[in-house]
């Protein structure tokens, strides 16, 4: 497990950045952190699918693609799956991954009580290093409706960006994996996260309406939720992010200080106005 380096917090006044600007700037970091979490989830699920089926179904288009240039090995004695991207390989969506993701598992993920613990060894997505420990525990399985409910805890989470800045994260979330009427894989996420942003300031994120991710959107290069609402707080300043009504796009509505605007989201840590 990676140890997060402690550092002195700086105030908005000392840093010369007002809180409303911090929320605006830091939300781009939130998008990147959330995208990194989803990326890791997709990769580890794909590796899981190599060795066992979920409800007798596969999703070859996505599963195979994300592991195209990775070496995946399973140690059945110690119950460890190692996903190795080597010195770096570019996926079909333009993301370059390097290093290793290590999954310690116990039980079939369709079984209540089974778990997966995910750690990283020098793992990067593009120029951003991903660290921390993610533990996933299955709490409910509904075979009739083809859904699995999982509690996920992130401890010691950290992203270190190419410019040397970093952000930390602790999170507690619940995810429900299911298939909709069209057969698309849909994930709903609830929960919260907190940490220290790239400016050294404490932040908190609360999901106030469940986030919805669609695997078909991932195929189209959309790595953000298609619907759901977040509340993002830095100091006394709060922003509300509404991801919309299910469209496969990178657009969201940000409301801050009573002013709403449409924004375009970038998973590489920058926010572009629409």
Which role does the model predict for each range below?
Residues 13-274:
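Low-complexity, intrinsically disordered segments exposed to solvent
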Residues 7-11:
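C-terminal motif of bacterial Sec signal peptides marking the signal peptidase cleavage site
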Residues 1-3:
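Sec-dependent signal peptide recognition
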């Amino acid at each position: 497990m990676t140890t997060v380096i402690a550092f002195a917090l700086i105030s908005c006044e000392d840093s010369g950045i007002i809180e409303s600007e911090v929320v605006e700037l830091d939300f781009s970091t939130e998008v990147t952190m959330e995208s990194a979490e989803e990326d890791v989830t997709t990769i580890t699920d794909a590796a899981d699918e190599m060795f066992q089926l979920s409800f007798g179904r596969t999703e070859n288009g996505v599963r195979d693609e994300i592991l195209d240039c990775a070496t995946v090995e399973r140690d059945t004695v110690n119950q460890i799956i190692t996903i190795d991207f080597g010195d770096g390989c570019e996926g079909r969506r333009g993301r370059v991954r390097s290093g290793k993701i290590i999954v310690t598992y116990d039980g079939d993920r369709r079984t209540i009580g089974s778990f997966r613990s995910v750690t990283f060894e020098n793992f990067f997505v593009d120029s951003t290093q991903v660290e921390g420990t993610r533990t996933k525990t299955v709490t409910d399985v509904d075979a009739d409706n083809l859904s699995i409910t999982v509690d996920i805890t992130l401890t010691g989470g950290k992203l270190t960006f190419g410019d040397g800045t970093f952000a930390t994260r602790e999170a507690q979330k619940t995810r429900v994996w299911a298939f909709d009427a069209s057969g698309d894989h849909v994930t709903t996420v609830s929960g919260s996260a907190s940490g220290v942003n790239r400016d050294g300031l404490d932040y908190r994120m609360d999901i106030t309406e469940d986030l919805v991710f669609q695997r078909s959107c991932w195929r189209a290069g959309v790595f953000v939720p298609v619907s759901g609402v977040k509340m993002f707080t830095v100091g006394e300043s709060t922003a509300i992010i509404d991801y919309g009504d299910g469209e496969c796009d990178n657009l969201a509505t940000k409301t801050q200080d009573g002013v709403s605007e449409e924004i375009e989201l970038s998973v590489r840590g920058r926010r572009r106005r629409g």
